[in-house]
Amino acid sequence: MSEQRDSRGMPQAGFIIEHQSSDHKWKVLRNIYSGPFSDVYVVADTVTNEKYAMKCERQEGNSRPVLKLDVMVLMATKGLRGFPNFVAAGRTDVYRYCIMQLVGPDLGRLRRTRPERKFSLPTALQILGQTLRRLEDLHNCGWLCRDVKAPNFCIGVGENESTVYILDFGFARKFVDKEGKIIPPRTAAALMGTFQYCAVSAHSHKDQCARDDLESWFYMGIELLKGPLPWANIDGHKNHKQIGEAKVAIRSEPLRSEFFEGVPKQFNEILTILDQTSYFDRPNYKKLGDLLSQAATEHQVTLKEPLDWQNNERMQQKAIFVGELGESHQASAKLDAKDNANESMDIEFDDMPPKEGISKSLSAEKSCTKNVETARTEK
């Protein structure tokens, strides 16, 4: 390997990644995100010059490595529409890496370029239809996301710019056993996800299920349609329970009517359906999709109209620019920090769950990822 590494031992521009079990090599073109334990790069195949994204994660000092979850989920969903193509994964003595399809800017950043920080109705409904299908596919593969939000969905680049991709599975968890049966909930679980979007049950340290991913999807949908959520300015790091209480409050009048003001009435029914779905139930994805179609019909829009970033030259240029750089949602958040100061951040713990069940919670998180070593050099 070449010697272009920074002081932490992480690769820099010009560094050559050599896959351990094949003759493939990738050249690092640029770093587009750098954090305490992880970096994201644009790399190019040294033979074809095709560009990819590469996520690297330091091994030393990383108390909760998550790249292995990305690898496991991308391998499980390989070939499914709207999931970045998994290319290769491996490790060096300093870091683990995963090479995958390059995608464009995330939906959170795109939304913030729009007037009033919301998408048009045709675009929002199309996004929600696509993201609903992504979650159904993920669940069918036996995985929960546990961090559904706009920044974890990106648009494609070039001819794929109308496709919405789901990515960043650092909080994912296997929720079915080898026989395909849903794993019973633990006594207590760590609060996983993002304050603004996590399900009400997560605020009470309950184990999450497929319904909870869809509850987060629902909050994301309201944000895409109306702009920032009512609890967007509450500091969840100081009081996440207040956000949970706000989510409970919008389920009753008079706040319920206010919450749904300006959005298709079908979203009121969507929330009712989700609240009636239990931990062990399979969500009615078809019914939810049908309600999106009904909303489009009632508002006389089609679900085949050009998307906002295809209609708007500024958004289109930004999408092409960011896509060419292969920017991840973390980099988007970094660039837009001043414009989006109150956005919640990913968390693992805010406060501790009840003492009973803590060890079960943590050991289960480890057990769902222990087999990743078999995939570390998988191509």
Curated annotation (Swiss-Prot):
Active site positions: 147
Similarity field: Belongs to the protein kinase superfamily. CK1 Ser/Thr protein kinase family.
Catalysed reactions listed for this entry: L-seryl-[protein] + ATP = O-phospho-L-seryl-[protein] + ADP + H(+); L-threonyl-[protein] + ATP = O-phospho-L-threonyl-[protein] + ADP + H(+)
Protein kinase domain location: 26-302
Gene Ontology CC entries for this record: cytoplasm; nucleus
Effect ascribed to mutating residue 256 to Q: In hc166; restores fertility in spe-27 mutants by rescuing initiation of spermiogenesis
EC number in record: 2.7.11.1
InterPro entries linked: CK1_Ser-Thr_kinase (IPR050235), Kinase-like_dom_sf (IPR011009), Prot_kinase_dom (IPR000719), TTBK_Asator-like_STKc (IPR047916)
Function, in words: Serine/threonine-protein kinase which is involved in spermatogenesis. In spermatocytes, regulates meiosis and the localization and assembly of major sperm protein (MSP) into fibrous bodies. In addition, may suppress the initiation of spermiogenesis downstream of spe-8, spe-12, spe-27 and spe-29.
SMART domains: S_TKc
Source domain of life: Eukaryota
Transmembrane segments: none
Biased composition (Polar residues): 360-372
Matching CDD domains: STKc_TTBK
Presence of keyword Heme: no
Outcome following mutation: residue 194 to I: In hc92 and hc143; sterile. Failure to assemble MSP into fibrous bodies and absence of spermatids due to spermatocytes arresting at the diakinesis stage
UniProt keyword list: ATP-binding, Differentiation, Kinase, Nucleotide-binding, Serine/threonine-protein kinase, Spermatogenesis, Transferase
Region annotation (Disordered) ranges: 331-379
Effect of residue 34 to P: In hc167; restores fertility in spe-27 mutants by rescuing initiation of spermiogenesis
Organism: Caenorhabditis elegans
GO MF: ATP binding; protein serine kinase activity; protein serine/threonine kinase activity
Record's protein name: Serine/threonine-protein kinase spe-6
Residues that bind ATP: 32-40, 55
Consequence of substituting residue 120 to F: In hc189; restores fertility in spe-27 mutants by rescuing initiation of spermiogenesis
EC top class, as a word: transferase
